[in-house]
Amino acid sequence: VADVARYKAETGKPVFDAAREAAVLDKNAARITDETLRPYYRAFLSDAMAVSRAYQRARLGRDTAAYQGVPGAWSQIALQRLFPFARQTACTTWGEVFDAVQSGDAQFGVLPFENSNAGDVSTVLDLLYTHPDIIISRMCDLPIRQDLLAVPGATLQTIRTVVSHPQALAQSSVFVQQHGFKTSTWGNTADAARHVAELNDPSVAAIASAETAGLYGLQILSAGINADGDNTTRFIVIERAAAAPAMTGEGQRLALLFTARHKPGQLAAALDQIGARGFNMECIKSRPLPHVPFEYYFYVQLVCPADSSGAACQALLDTLTSVCSTLRLLGAFTLDGTEK
Protein backbone atom coordinates (compact mmCIF):
# COMPACT_ATOMS: atom_id res chain seq x y z
CA VAL A 1 0.00 0.00 0.00
CA ALA A 2 2.92 2.34 0.73
CA ASP A 3 4.19 1.73 -2.82
CA VAL A 4 0.77 2.62 -4.21
CA ALA A 5 0.72 5.84 -2.18
CA ARG A 6 4.22 6.72 -3.42
CA TYR A 7 3.20 6.08 -7.04
CA LYS A 8 0.14 8.31 -6.72
CA ALA A 9 2.22 11.05 -5.13
CA GLU A 10 4.75 10.91 -7.97
CA THR A 11 2.13 10.87 -10.74
CA GLY A 12 -0.39 13.24 -9.14
CA LYS A 13 -3.15 10.65 -9.39
CA PRO A 14 -6.04 10.87 -6.92
CA VAL A 15 -6.22 8.43 -4.04
CA PHE A 16 -9.78 7.49 -4.98
CA ASP A 17 -10.66 6.58 -8.57
CA ALA A 18 -14.29 5.47 -8.44
CA ALA A 19 -14.39 3.96 -11.93
CA ARG A 20 -11.15 2.04 -11.39
CA GLU A 21 -12.24 0.63 -8.04
CA ALA A 22 -15.64 -0.34 -9.46
CA ALA A 23 -13.91 -2.24 -12.27
CA VAL A 24 -11.64 -4.05 -9.80
CA LEU A 25 -14.64 -5.01 -7.67
CA ASP A 26 -16.56 -6.28 -10.70
CA LYS A 27 -13.61 -8.32 -11.98
CA ASN A 28 -12.80 -9.99 -8.67
CA ALA A 29 -16.39 -10.58 -7.54
CA ALA A 30 -17.09 -12.33 -10.86
CA ARG A 31 -14.61 -15.05 -9.86
CA ILE A 32 -16.86 -16.16 -7.01
CA THR A 33 -19.24 -18.75 -8.43
CA ASP A 34 -21.34 -19.08 -5.27
CA GLU A 35 -24.03 -16.40 -5.60
CA THR A 36 -24.67 -16.47 -1.85
CA LEU A 37 -21.05 -15.69 -1.02
CA ARG A 38 -20.41 -13.20 -3.83
CA PRO A 39 -21.91 -10.07 -2.14
CA TYR A 40 -19.99 -10.83 1.09
CA TYR A 41 -16.74 -11.15 -0.83
CA ARG A 42 -17.47 -7.91 -2.66
CA ALA A 43 -18.18 -6.13 0.65
CA PHE A 44 -14.91 -7.51 2.06
CA LEU A 45 -12.94 -6.16 -0.90
CA SER A 46 -14.69 -2.80 -0.65
CA ASP A 47 -13.80 -2.51 3.05
CA ALA A 48 -10.18 -3.47 2.31
CA MET A 49 -10.02 -0.74 -0.34
CA ALA A 50 -11.41 1.80 2.13
CA VAL A 51 -8.68 0.92 4.66
CA SER A 52 -6.07 1.18 1.89
CA ARG A 53 -7.34 4.64 0.88
CA ALA A 54 -7.22 5.85 4.49
CA TYR A 55 -3.60 4.70 4.81
CA GLN A 56 -2.61 6.26 1.48
CA ARG A 57 -4.12 9.59 2.45
CA ALA A 58 -2.35 9.48 5.79
CA ARG A 59 0.98 8.89 3.99
CA LEU A 60 0.24 11.69 1.54
CA GLY A 61 -1.10 14.10 4.15
CA ARG A 62 -4.32 14.56 2.17
CA ASP A 63 -6.94 13.47 4.69
CA THR A 64 -8.89 16.11 6.60
CA ALA A 65 -12.32 15.25 7.95
CA ALA A 66 -14.83 17.65 9.50
CA TYR A 67 -17.49 17.05 12.12
CA GLN A 68 -19.90 19.15 14.18
CA GLY A 69 -19.27 19.53 17.90
CA VAL A 70 -16.32 19.14 20.22
CA PRO A 71 -14.10 16.15 21.10
CA GLY A 72 -16.27 13.38 22.52
CA ALA A 73 -19.29 14.18 20.34
CA TRP A 74 -20.83 11.14 18.68
CA SER A 75 -19.91 12.57 15.27
CA GLN A 76 -16.28 12.79 16.38
CA ILE A 77 -16.40 9.22 17.69
CA ALA A 78 -17.81 8.03 14.35
CA LEU A 79 -15.16 10.04 12.48
CA GLN A 80 -12.36 8.55 14.56
CA ARG A 81 -13.50 5.03 13.75
CA LEU A 82 -14.08 5.74 10.06
CA PHE A 83 -10.93 7.80 9.47
CA PRO A 84 -8.46 6.91 12.24
CA PHE A 85 -5.54 8.59 10.43
CA ALA A 86 -7.29 11.81 9.40
CA ARG A 87 -6.72 15.31 10.68
CA GLN A 88 -9.92 16.35 12.43
CA THR A 89 -11.65 19.70 12.02
CA ALA A 90 -14.38 20.64 14.52
CA CYS A 91 -17.24 22.82 13.27
CA THR A 92 -19.91 24.69 15.20
CA THR A 93 -22.84 23.72 12.96
CA TRP A 94 -23.75 21.07 10.41
CA GLY A 95 -23.82 23.83 7.80
CA GLU A 96 -20.17 24.60 8.55
CA VAL A 97 -19.28 20.96 7.89
CA PHE A 98 -20.85 21.28 4.43
CA ASP A 99 -19.02 24.56 3.87
CA ALA A 100 -15.68 22.98 4.82
CA VAL A 101 -16.18 20.15 2.32
CA GLN A 102 -17.54 22.49 -0.37
CA SER A 103 -14.52 24.80 -0.08
CA GLY A 104 -11.97 21.98 -0.01
CA ASP A 105 -10.83 22.74 3.53
CA ALA A 106 -11.92 19.18 4.36
CA GLN A 107 -12.04 16.17 2.05
CA PHE A 108 -14.76 14.49 4.12
CA GLY A 109 -17.55 15.42 6.48
CA VAL A 110 -19.13 13.04 8.99
CA LEU A 111 -22.71 13.83 9.97
CA PRO A 112 -25.61 12.11 11.76
CA PHE A 113 -28.40 11.24 9.35
CA GLU A 114 -30.93 9.17 11.25
CA ASN A 115 -31.43 7.60 14.67
CA SER A 116 -33.29 4.34 15.19
CA ASN A 117 -35.18 5.86 18.13
CA ALA A 118 -35.44 9.63 17.53
CA GLY A 119 -35.79 9.53 13.73
CA ASP A 120 -34.44 11.78 10.98
CA VAL A 121 -31.93 14.57 11.25
CA SER A 122 -33.96 16.67 8.82
CA THR A 123 -31.55 19.62 8.79
CA VAL A 124 -28.79 17.43 7.34
CA LEU A 125 -31.15 16.17 4.63
CA ASP A 126 -32.07 19.75 3.72
CA LEU A 127 -28.38 20.66 3.53
CA LEU A 128 -27.81 17.77 1.13
CA TYR A 129 -30.62 19.08 -1.06
CA THR A 130 -29.20 22.61 -1.17
CA HIS A 131 -25.59 21.51 -1.90
CA PRO A 132 -25.73 19.92 -5.37
CA ASP A 133 -21.95 19.35 -5.54
CA ILE A 134 -21.96 17.19 -2.40
CA ILE A 135 -22.50 13.43 -2.48
CA ILE A 136 -22.85 10.68 0.12
CA SER A 137 -19.82 8.42 -0.31
CA ARG A 138 -20.34 6.14 2.65
CA MET A 139 -22.94 5.30 5.27
CA CYS A 140 -22.39 3.51 8.56
CA ASP A 141 -24.29 2.57 11.70
CA LEU A 142 -22.91 3.34 15.16
CA PRO A 143 -24.49 1.86 18.31
CA ILE A 144 -25.26 4.68 20.75
CA ARG A 145 -25.16 4.34 24.53
CA GLN A 146 -26.19 7.45 26.42
CA ASP A 147 -24.78 7.83 29.94
CA LEU A 148 -25.67 10.26 32.72
CA LEU A 149 -22.52 12.22 33.62
CA ALA A 150 -21.85 14.54 36.55
CA VAL A 151 -18.98 16.04 38.51
CA PRO A 152 -17.22 13.85 41.10
CA GLY A 153 -19.19 13.71 44.34
CA ALA A 154 -22.60 14.13 42.70
CA THR A 155 -25.24 11.40 43.10
CA LEU A 156 -28.61 10.69 41.53
CA GLN A 157 -30.14 12.30 44.60
CA THR A 158 -28.29 15.61 44.10
CA ILE A 159 -29.21 15.98 40.41
CA ARG A 160 -32.01 18.43 39.60
CA THR A 161 -31.34 19.39 35.96
CA VAL A 162 -30.08 17.42 32.97
CA VAL A 163 -28.60 19.14 29.90
CA SER A 164 -28.02 17.58 26.49
CA HIS A 165 -28.84 17.69 22.79
CA PRO A 166 -32.61 17.40 22.11
CA GLN A 167 -32.21 13.98 20.48
CA ALA A 168 -30.24 12.62 23.44
CA LEU A 169 -32.93 13.95 25.78
CA ALA A 170 -35.61 12.30 23.63
CA GLN A 171 -33.75 8.99 23.60
CA SER A 172 -33.43 9.09 27.42
CA SER A 173 -36.84 10.61 28.21
CA VAL A 174 -38.15 7.60 30.16
CA PHE A 175 -35.18 7.67 32.55
CA VAL A 176 -35.36 11.46 32.94
CA GLN A 177 -39.10 11.42 33.69
CA GLN A 178 -38.78 8.55 36.17
CA HIS A 179 -36.33 10.63 38.22
CA GLY A 180 -38.23 13.88 37.87
CA PHE A 181 -35.30 15.79 36.40
CA LYS A 182 -35.74 19.13 34.68
CA THR A 183 -34.19 19.34 31.22
CA SER A 184 -32.25 21.98 29.34
CA THR A 185 -31.33 21.63 25.66
CA TRP A 186 -27.78 22.05 24.41
CA GLY A 187 -26.28 22.15 20.96
CA ASN A 188 -24.17 19.02 21.36
CA THR A 189 -23.88 16.16 23.85
CA ALA A 190 -20.13 16.53 24.33
CA ASP A 191 -20.38 20.30 24.73
CA ALA A 192 -23.11 19.74 27.33
CA ALA A 193 -20.66 17.52 29.24
CA ARG A 194 -17.97 20.19 29.01
CA HIS A 195 -20.48 22.75 30.32
CA VAL A 196 -21.31 20.52 33.31
CA ALA A 197 -17.61 20.10 34.07
CA GLU A 198 -17.08 23.88 33.97
CA LEU A 199 -20.13 24.52 36.19
CA ASN A 200 -18.84 22.09 38.82
CA ASP A 201 -22.38 21.95 40.22
CA PRO A 202 -23.51 18.59 41.69
CA SER A 203 -27.14 19.41 40.87
CA VAL A 204 -26.53 19.47 37.08
CA ALA A 205 -25.79 16.44 34.91
CA ALA A 206 -25.26 15.84 31.20
CA ILE A 207 -26.34 13.03 28.90
CA ALA A 208 -23.38 12.07 26.71
CA SER A 209 -20.95 9.27 25.85
CA ALA A 210 -18.61 7.43 28.19
CA GLU A 211 -15.72 8.75 26.09
CA THR A 212 -16.83 12.27 26.98
CA ALA A 213 -16.70 11.50 30.70
CA GLY A 214 -13.03 10.65 30.41
CA LEU A 215 -12.27 13.78 28.39
CA TYR A 216 -13.83 16.20 30.86
CA GLY A 217 -13.19 14.51 34.20
CA LEU A 218 -16.80 13.52 34.90
CA GLN A 219 -18.16 10.40 36.57
CA ILE A 220 -20.82 8.11 35.12
CA LEU A 221 -23.81 8.16 37.48
CA SER A 222 -25.90 5.80 35.36
CA ALA A 223 -24.89 3.97 32.19
CA GLY A 224 -27.07 3.15 29.20
CA ILE A 225 -30.03 5.35 30.12
CA ASN A 226 -31.45 5.52 26.58
CA ALA A 227 -34.79 3.73 26.41
CA ASP A 228 -33.92 1.62 23.36
CA GLY A 229 -31.14 -0.83 24.08
CA ASP A 230 -30.58 -1.16 20.33
CA ASN A 231 -30.26 2.60 19.87
CA THR A 232 -28.24 3.21 16.72
CA THR A 233 -27.35 6.34 14.79
CA ARG A 234 -26.70 6.18 11.07
CA PHE A 235 -23.89 8.49 9.97
CA ILE A 236 -23.07 9.62 6.47
CA VAL A 237 -19.75 10.61 4.96
CA ILE A 238 -20.01 13.49 2.50
CA GLU A 239 -17.55 14.51 -0.19
CA ARG A 240 -17.41 17.07 -2.95
CA ALA A 241 -17.71 15.15 -6.19
CA ALA A 242 -16.20 16.06 -9.53
CA ALA A 243 -18.38 13.41 -11.19
CA ALA A 244 -21.48 11.37 -10.45
CA PRO A 245 -21.07 8.49 -7.98
CA ALA A 246 -19.99 5.21 -9.58
CA MET A 247 -22.84 2.69 -9.66
CA THR A 248 -21.82 -0.97 -9.61
CA GLY A 249 -25.11 -2.61 -8.67
CA GLU A 250 -25.12 -5.67 -6.42
CA GLY A 251 -24.07 -4.89 -2.85
CA GLN A 252 -24.70 -1.16 -3.21
CA ARG A 253 -27.31 1.24 -1.98
CA LEU A 254 -28.47 4.19 -4.06
CA ALA A 255 -29.61 7.48 -2.52
CA LEU A 256 -31.84 9.61 -4.74
CA LEU A 257 -33.35 13.08 -4.39
CA PHE A 258 -36.25 13.92 -6.68
CA THR A 259 -39.33 16.05 -7.15
CA ALA A 260 -42.55 14.82 -8.72
CA ARG A 261 -44.90 16.70 -10.97
CA HIS A 262 -47.77 18.18 -8.98
CA LYS A 263 -50.37 15.93 -10.64
CA PRO A 264 -52.33 12.86 -9.51
CA GLY A 265 -50.34 9.63 -9.57
CA GLN A 266 -46.92 11.10 -10.36
CA LEU A 267 -45.25 10.00 -7.12
CA ALA A 268 -46.82 6.55 -7.43
CA ALA A 269 -45.50 6.28 -10.99
CA ALA A 270 -41.94 6.90 -9.80
CA LEU A 271 -42.23 4.37 -6.98
CA ASP A 272 -43.77 1.80 -9.33
CA GLN A 273 -40.70 1.99 -11.57
CA ILE A 274 -38.41 1.33 -8.61
CA GLY A 275 -40.31 -1.80 -7.60
CA ALA A 276 -40.80 -3.04 -11.15
CA ARG A 277 -37.03 -3.12 -11.71
CA GLY A 278 -36.38 -5.13 -8.54
CA PHE A 279 -34.92 -2.38 -6.35
CA ASN A 280 -35.94 -2.58 -2.70
CA MET A 281 -36.86 0.82 -1.27
CA GLU A 282 -35.51 0.92 2.29
CA CYS A 283 -36.95 4.32 3.09
CA ILE A 284 -38.70 7.35 1.67
CA LYS A 285 -38.68 10.80 3.24
CA SER A 286 -40.38 14.01 2.19
CA ARG A 287 -39.28 17.55 3.01
CA PRO A 288 -40.66 20.99 2.06
CA LEU A 289 -39.12 22.48 -1.07
CA PRO A 290 -37.12 25.63 -0.23
CA HIS A 291 -38.99 28.78 -1.26
CA VAL A 292 -41.92 26.80 -2.74
CA PRO A 293 -44.81 26.73 -0.23
CA PHE A 294 -46.54 23.38 0.27
CA GLU A 295 -44.53 21.46 -2.30
CA TYR A 296 -42.00 18.79 -1.40
CA TYR A 297 -38.89 16.94 -2.48
CA PHE A 298 -38.34 13.25 -1.77
CA TYR A 299 -35.38 11.21 -0.59
CA VAL A 300 -35.37 7.48 -1.30
CA GLN A 301 -32.77 4.88 -0.40
CA LEU A 302 -32.67 1.77 -2.54
CA VAL A 303 -30.98 -1.61 -2.23
CA CYS A 304 -29.67 -2.85 -5.57
CA PRO A 305 -31.01 -6.32 -6.45
CA ALA A 306 -28.75 -9.36 -6.48
CA ASP A 307 -26.80 -9.80 -9.72
CA SER A 308 -27.61 -6.24 -10.79
CA SER A 309 -25.05 -4.13 -12.62
CA GLY A 310 -24.17 -0.51 -13.08
CA ALA A 311 -26.11 -0.63 -16.34
CA ALA A 312 -29.25 -1.76 -14.49
CA CYS A 313 -28.86 1.15 -12.08
CA GLN A 314 -28.45 3.60 -14.96
CA ALA A 315 -31.53 2.17 -16.68
CA LEU A 316 -33.56 2.87 -13.54
CA LEU A 317 -32.30 6.46 -13.42
CA ASP A 318 -33.11 6.96 -17.10
CA THR A 319 -36.66 5.77 -16.50
CA LEU A 320 -37.11 7.93 -13.41
CA THR A 321 -35.84 10.97 -15.31
CA SER A 322 -38.81 10.65 -17.65
CA VAL A 323 -41.23 10.44 -14.71
CA CYS A 324 -39.81 12.95 -12.22
CA SER A 325 -39.55 16.72 -12.52
CA THR A 326 -35.99 16.62 -11.16
CA LEU A 327 -33.74 13.71 -10.22
CA ARG A 328 -30.32 13.62 -8.56
CA LEU A 329 -28.14 10.66 -7.69
CA LEU A 330 -26.99 11.63 -4.21
CA GLY A 331 -24.87 8.58 -3.55
CA ALA A 332 -23.95 5.00 -4.48
CA PHE A 333 -22.31 3.28 -1.53
CA THR A 334 -22.15 0.29 0.78
CA LEU A 335 -23.61 0.30 4.29
CA ASP A 336 -21.38 -0.87 7.09
CA GLY A 337 -21.01 -0.69 10.84
CA THR A 338 -18.12 1.02 12.59
CA GLU A 339 -17.94 -1.86 15.03
CA LYS A 340 -17.19 -5.25 13.51
Regions inferred by a protein language model and the residue ranges of each:
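Domain-level signature for soluble enzymes in the chorismate/prephenate branch of the shikimate pathway
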Residues: 1-340
